[in-house]
Amino acid sequence: MKWAAKNELYVAVDEPLLLFVGQHIWEKNVKLIIEALAKVKDLPYHALFVGDGYARADMQTIAAKLGLSGNSDYRKDKITFFGSVQSRELMQMIYTAADLFLFPSIYDNAPLVVREAASLFTPSIVARGSNTAEIIQDGINGFLSDNDVTAFANRLRYILERPTIISWAAKGAAETLVRSWEDIAVEVLDRY
């Protein structure tokens, strides 16, 4: 399923696909992601940024200056800025193709995107101490990193060099972070 989704998106099936979905605004800690990706550009991966926002042009400039995008040979690009996606089917395909979801935001208090990724067996790496980190058990259903470029890059390197831990965390994320509407309805009825 993952390989088929990668093929549909013209992404190499033999390299990890890293994903960020959300507003392209500084509050989401997107600069940290780009700078951390530059520190691990010697590793095989491709990062996909889905969304739009006031910081998108600056993000693209930073990525180009760091040699991550805008190369004359697009196959050397490590980052693609995909833009906004309105189609649920396309978004599902993107999450399915992804191997690791990047979400170091300390701005969000209960992001749905981490659970969306988990529902399609994509674990997340989040900032330790953020509200999102409260639902992540490091190495079990996702990954934690300090809110620092070097720490995030080191954590990415550790994860990317050990693809089997991504598989374990993907299974854990799907088992522990995903809840059906029926489960939620029962919980609401029990409380009220």
Language model regions located:
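Conserved donor-binding/catalytic core segment of Leloir-type glycosyltransferases
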Residues: 11-28, 34-37
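Short alpha-helical donor nucleotide-sugar binding micro-motif in glycosyltransferases
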Residues: 84, 92-98
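Aromatic "clamp/platform" in nucleotide-sugar-dependent glycosyltransferases that forms part
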Residues: 106
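Short hydrophobic beta-strand element within catalytic cores of glycosyltransferases
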Residues: 123-127
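Conserved acidic donor-binding segment of nucleotide-sugar-dependent glycosyltransferases
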Residues: 138-139, 143-149, 158-163
